[in-house]
Curated annotation (Swiss-Prot):
Coiled coil, from the record: none
Protein's UniProt keywords contain Cell division: no
Naturally occurring in which organism (per UniProt): Rhodospirillum rubrum (strain ATCC 11170 / ATH 1.1.1 / DSM 467 / LMG 4362 / NCIMB 8255 / S1)
Name of the protein: Uroporphyrinogen decarboxylase
Similarity field: Belongs to the uroporphyrinogen decarboxylase family.
Function: Catalyzes the decarboxylation of four acetate groups of uroporphyrinogen-III to yield coproporphyrinogen-III.
Amino acid sequence: MSVPSKTQKPFLQALAGETLSPPPVWLMRQAGRYLPEYRATREEAGGFLDLCYTPKLAVEVTLQPLRRYAFDAAILFSDILVVPNAIGRQVAFKQGEGPVLDPLTSRADVEALEPGKLRERLGPVFETVRGLASAIPSTTALIGFAGAPWTVATYMLEGGSSKDFSVAKSWIYSRPDDFAALMEVLISATTDYLIAQIDAGAEAIQIFDTWAGVLPETEFHRWVIEPIGRITRALHEQRPGVPVIGFPKGAGVLYETFIRETGVDGVGLDASVPLAWAAKTLQPLCTVQGNMDPLLLVEGGPLMEQAVKRLLDTLGHGPFIFNLGHGIVPQTPPENVARLIDLVRAPR
């Protein structure tokens, strides 16, 4: 069987800088709790990490939204916290509580991390990627992903989600050497993880820096831009031709510097980014992806239709991938997603 060329995959064409009408579309968390078939598979798996680490089921939930909506890209079903789990930290997902980790408290904890075990321990994830590469439609692109080092570090230091990131920030300010040592481990482990995903069949990579926006400018440069830039350059050098999308959520005006200094091929915009500014300032630098508010997808109706039109009118004249500003939320009606796809793909 011949491998489809990238020119047959609109998502990859857009990331290569082409302007397409209609633009390619996929949605963050397109495999998720809003789909009844996902909830059934999740129940079959038991725990959330069991679902991530069971290739047959992870392939199934990745394919479920493609069957309904024929998105232009599939994204590996996994979680950013499989990386800390693979390098030696306990990770659990508790109902109503989110992720719970055994927090790092010392330099000794950092030095005890085991990045050399990552590939072996994440073998099931790479098996999922291989399964998806052979199962997705020929015009659908396969996205691999990881959390950015800063965002993953916050979970490892805070022990889970945080309102103020006081522990992680205190490591930056009062224990800079220890924090830098942790980030070095995560930069190396993340690069290794993404290269292994590419080798298993991922055709593009997205790096999620969910908590990028909580850092002041100086720290944003040091702990968001520099690590993602290093990972992006390593991927470009070692696996040329595989595009990288950065998603520094909440970066504000620093989005421009982020694009220029990391060398990403595409950038995910959160819902707060002004569209006219993005079209004028960001789109000449790289492909932009986003950025409808996920709650408008819950609302549906005229408000959603107006938002889709605004996005297409403003960003549709350059390299653009339609997406949300963050992930689909569980209360989203599946029929609203179908309507969204129809709107994006309607002749203009």
